[in-house]
Amino acid sequence: MDDDGLLLNFAAPDSNASSKSSAQKPVKVSGGRWKDRRKLQLSLSGRGRNKRAETGVNKESIAQPRDFSSSKPQSFREEQLAKRPKYFESRGEGGKNETYVSSLFTSNTKSKLENEKVEEEKTYLPSNAPMKGADDFNGLGLNDNLVHHLTESLRFKNPTQIQKSVIPSLLSTSRDLFVKAQTGSGKTLSFLLPILHKLMQEKKNPITRESGVFAIVLVPTRELANQIYGVLETLTRCHHQIVPGIVIGGEKKKSEKARIRKGVNILVATPGRLADHIENTTSLDLSQLRYLILDEGDRLIDLGFEETITKITDTITRCSRISESTQKWQGLPTKRVNVLCSATMENNVEKLGSIILNNPEQISIDTSKSREGDEIDSKSMAPAQLTQRVVVVPAKLRLVTLSAVLKEVAKTAPTSSTEIVRTIVFFSCSDSVNFHYEAFKRNGSEFRKARNAETNRFEMVTVGEDEANAEGSDTEIPKISSAPTISANSVVYKLHGSLTQQVRTSTLQSFVQAVPFDNSENNYNHLILLCTDVASRGLDLPNISSVVEYDPPFSVQDHLHRIGRTARLGNKGSSYLFLLPGIEEGYVDGKIRVVHPEGSIRITNYETILQNAFGDSSEIKKSDPKSKQGKWDMHATTWHLDIERWLLEDAASHESAKQAFTSHIRAYATHLSSEKTFFNVKTLHLGHLAKSFGLREPPKKLGSLATKSSSTRKEYGEKSRKLEDPRKKMLRMAKLAASSASSEFNY
């Protein structure tokens, strides 16, 4: 039988089936923890979890890099590699104590403002200069002795435009005045001269110090009060019967009471201290007050003195007895004349004017017109002869660029020791002033004012280390030191509201007065004042060649008052405004261009400033033709690294730098809401900004260190302070509260 095509089927046992049957049987595991036994039991039964590969947001394995070869052509990959930067900043764990050393010239944001090429520099006639060819002070109707003293002793030749407008008005009428004029135009003399003229004209019943107070000048800051008082002392030398006086916060009230008790005719005061004397000094007689002058009215409002001023004026009105003495002093006004001086006519100033002034006469010399032809009445203008330079600097390069600007100004200082060049640098907070003062005076000598026994003249003598560290020196000796990190001929000062009044006054006097230094090796003829806005209002500082706004102003009016310290009374001047790349660049066209004459703003490249300051002209590509001229970038980097190493070695200076950094951020966040478009704290690169303070720590660590002072002291090996005795602390706080109860806003 043929069996071809016959198929036989055999049922063989399936191995999978046998395994399934065996797997269905539970596996018993004993010993160990329950969790471990359960995991082992599940794994043996085939029910364990499958480990998934770790993936990123694009579902690609993190362990294996993505392969671009299949999706992108070779030419595209080569093009992308060519676009990559050659240098990268370290983003690892950092060095010792988690610090980072980054390059100054990498990862910087570039400026979008183009450097303006000026083919022919425009020249403007000075807008605040004395009027040449106009009538002199004799033509204004002033007292002959006063005019002779002005022209012969004080060397005033011609009045300014604002003086020519205000003086005749105060002499002829008794109307209240609202005076608006740009800074540096001579407003102080415009209201002091008519008052002195009226008091000097009383021949029948001469004015003496016992006659009472006839004029009060209210000012916002103590420095401005001291300056006006100094001008009054100079003017009254031609008529000793008229006695000026001053009452300001920070001085001893007992001494002020004694001066008031002896008699004062013209009183210069700050609002808080004057209100205190009105309440507590019975010898202060304001019944014959004829003139009330409010200088820098906009600043008085900004500092919150509106309520205090209203209270002062109400008290003066209530105790006035002018009607009883009109026959005795017939040349004086028959009612009180109020004068409000301000750089702007904003709403808050107009509100103060409506409270203080009664049917006032408005005098303004600002007739500038905008580009559209509309007259600008609400804003003051910068002096026409001022050159405004805008420097857009990356955050990391701010400190080294500031030193370069000061080096450049120091090079322009004359070689003669009699000619002195002065520069003012404005900061946003006092902590920043302290840090930069310590940074610039590093390895320098401190000075103080002393009388030479041989010549009987004052000069600046070197302060010894023991004297500088002596107890009480911080409250008595002004902060003056040489600045070898800038130049051999530079001297640096510091001024802010946290200093005592004695130090503030002596610092300003030393900065203004040309006192020779006892060190004959160096010709210290470049004086640098590091300050806050406490020195931006009304101060008439001579020979200010340059003003540097290192931190942007908080308003356009602050900008005008800052730059108004230079280019005064027709003299030329220059100012620098530091801005960061990005949204801050819009501040030029958005805010300040309208208050500057057309063509007076210069966009300056920071690299050009660094090249001029750190480039060595004697080394011009001698051996290496590829090297930059003078290797200015290497010199700038070395200068900045020296600052960083100094902070690492000096724990106190390092703490000062951290405090300055955090205070700078807080101050930056307080810009007006109308300017948040240009100054937004959220757009700051805090790491790069910390670099400009010489810090190597990341900002997050700086913030944590600022809140942990005890750990900071342990880290740098400082001894922890002993707890203060509760009784001594209570007495100290009571004395502090008593001394500051009537003091001014610590600005």
Curated annotation (Swiss-Prot):
Keyword Oxidoreductase applies: no
Function as written in the Swiss-Prot or TrEMBL entry: ATP-binding RNA helicase involved in the biogenesis of 60S ribosomal subunits and is required for the normal formation of 25S and 5.8S rRNAs.
Region entry Disordered, spans: 1-102, 111-130, 700-729
PROSITE patterns to which the protein is assigned, alphabetical: HELICASE_ATP_BIND_1 (PS51192), HELICASE_CTER (PS51194), Q_MOTIF (PS51195)
Domain comment in the entry: The Q motif is unique to and characteristic of the DEAD box family of RNA helicases and controls ATP binding and hydrolysis.
Localization: Nucleus, Nucleolus
Protein name: ATP-dependent RNA helicase DBP7
Domain of life from the UniProt record: Eukaryota
GO terms, molecular function: ATP binding; ATP hydrolysis activity; RNA binding; RNA helicase activity
N-terminal signal peptide: none
GO biological process, one term: rRNA processing
Note from the entry: Present with 1460 molecules/cell in log phase SD medium.
Family: Belongs to the DEAD box helicase family. DDX31/DBP7 subfamily.
Helicase C-terminal domain location: 401-626
Domain Helicase ATP-binding as annotated: residue spans: 168-363
Biased composition (Basic and acidic residues): 75-96, 111-123, 712-728
Chief localization: nucleus
Catalytically driven reaction(s): ATP + H2O = ADP + phosphate + H(+)
One term under GO cellular component: nucleolus
First-level EC class: hydrolase
Motif Q motif positions after renumbering to this chain: 135-164
Lineage of the organism: Eukaryota, Fungi, Dikarya, Ascomycota, Saccharomycotina
Amino acids binding ATP: A181, Q182, T183, G184, S185, G186, K187, T188
EC number: 3.6.4.13
